[in-house]
């Protein structure tokens, strides 16, 4: 859903209830989380399987190389940003997956399963405790894992709220075209 007329021009913040939504609206796999000034997203925190830290770090390099070889690889996910963090606060190593994207929670998860199954690139989640072995053929189990490990934010802010990644790229292409045009006029 694109930003409405000039909705993007005024920064916006949204305080979100503890549950992660304002009213229960059922999606395919559970409650629908709201679109916020930062679009859609989730923060998943899960314990890392013993001895898998190096595999997770290496997987970051795999994704980097895959994107270098095929820049549009993750395009079906309609991502703005991904951030991965490993941390230990005394209870074992944990992994945090933060994603900001333009689709709802359930669609993002379904698209991720499809993308990883078709591309042959697996998911980093295979290194996490409790992640289902049959994730490629059992979307319900994949979604259950993601929802069980989702920690909803309670505040989201957007400097340019509700703007999709496609709208941002379009604006940047337009800016580049204008710059090129002005350079030609010199």
Where do the PLM segments sit?
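Conserved short beta-strand edge segments in small beta-sheet-based binding/regulatory domains
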Residues: 118-133
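Short S/T/G/P-rich N-terminal loop/turn motif that feeds into the first structured element of a domain
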Residues: 2-94, 100-115, 131-186
């Amino acid at each position: 859903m694109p930003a409405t007329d000039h909705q993007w021009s005024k920064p916006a913040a949204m305080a979100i209830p503890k549950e992660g939504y304002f009213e229960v609206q059922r999606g395919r796999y559970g409650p629908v989380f709201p679109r916020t000034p930062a679009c859609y997203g989730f923060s998943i925190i899960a314990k890392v399987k013993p001895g898998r830290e190096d595999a997770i770090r290496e997987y970051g390099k795999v994704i980097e190389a895959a994107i270098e070889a095929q820049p549009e690889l993750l395009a079906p996910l309609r991502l703005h940003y991904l951030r991965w963090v490993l941390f230990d606060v005394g209870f074992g190593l944990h992994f945090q997956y933060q994603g900001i994207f333009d689709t709802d929670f359930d669609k993002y998860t379904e698209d991720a399963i499809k993308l990883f199954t078709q591309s042959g690139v697996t998911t980093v989640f295979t290194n996490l405790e409790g992640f289902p072995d049959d994730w490629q053929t059992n979307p319900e189990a994949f979604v259950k894992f993601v929802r069980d490990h989702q920690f909803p934010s309670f505040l989201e802010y957007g400097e340019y709220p509700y703007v999709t990644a496609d709208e941002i790229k379009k604006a940047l292409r337009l800016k580049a075209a204008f710059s090129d045009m002005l350079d030609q006029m010199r």
